[in-house]
Swiss-Prot record:
Keywords: Coiled coil, DNA-binding, Transcription, Transcription regulation
Name of a matching Pfam family: GreA_GreB
Similarity remark: Belongs to the GreA/GreB family.
Residue stretches in coiled coil: 10-76
Purpose of the protein: Necessary for efficient RNA polymerase transcription elongation past template-encoded arresting sites. The arresting sites in DNA have the property of trapping a certain fraction of elongating RNA polymerases that pass through, resulting in locked ternary complexes. Cleavage of the nascent transcript by cleavage factors such as GreA or GreB allows the resumption of elongation from the new 3'terminus. GreA releases sequences of 2 to 3 nucleotides.
This protein's name: Transcription elongation factor GreA
DNA repair is among the record's keywords: no
InterPro entries cross-referenced by the UniProt entry: GreA/GreB_C_sf, TF_GreA/GreB_CS, Tscrpt_elong_fac_GreA, Tscrpt_elong_fac_GreA/B, Tscrpt_elong_fac_GreA/B_C, Tscrpt_elong_fac_GreA/B_fam, Tscrpt_elong_fac_GreA/B_N, Tscrpt_elong_fac_GreA/B_N_sf
NCBIfam families, per the entry: greA (TIGR01462), PRK00226.1-4 (NF001263)
Gene: greA
GO BP of this protein: DNA-templated transcription elongation; regulation of DNA-templated transcription elongation
Disulfide links within the chain: none
Length: 158
């Protein structure tokens, strides 16, 4: 059997996944089973859209449970103190300024399981993170973004 991919995440990210898993197993699963029971009571299952919808939801919930269990099983916790404090790496927050417009941005580089660009968390697999990883303060880096390449200067790493 091939070795499963490590899922890099912070301790906080792992706790969120564990909470979601608990919710799915204890509450959501029961809600879906109840929906299936109610839909079955409507009679003929061959043309029962409520039943079909509930079964699809059940498949989604069970798939998500399986996905989360796999991520937790293969979790590699990112310790905040790991690595050189002056080098952009997994778990670090990096602040940079776009050249030449001067706009400052800040992102924390996390594992893909907990990335959320709206919260300033980008996946270590993203093109932007890949461009920044391994660089130090004052480095000028060409960063790949969905809108194309941009030049940035790293201001702070923490």
């Amino acid at each position: 059997m091939a070795e499963e991919k490590k899922h890099y995440m912070t301790l906080e990210g792992k706790k969120k996944l564990e909470e979601e898993l608990e919710y799915l197993k204890t509450e959501r699963r029961k809600e879906v089973v109840e929906r299936i029971k109610i839909a079955r009571s409507f009679g003929d299952l061959s043309e029962n859209s409520e039943y079909d919808s509930a079964k699809e939801e059940q498949a989604f919930v069970e798939g998500r449970i399986s996905q989360i269990e796999k991520m937790i099983r293969n979790a590699e916790i990112i310790e905040e103190s790991e690595g050189d404090a002056n080098v952009v790496s997994l778990g670090k927050t990096v602040k940079f300024v776009e050249i030449p417009d001067g706009e400052e941005e800040e992102y924390t580089i996390v594992g893909s399981a907990e990335s959320d660009p709206f919260e300033g968390k980008i996946s270590n697999d993203s093109p932007m993170a890949q461009s920044l990883l391994g660089h130090t303060i004052d480095d000028v880096v060409i960063v790949n973004t969905p809108g194309g390449e941009m030049e940035v200067k790293i201001l702070e790493i923490r």
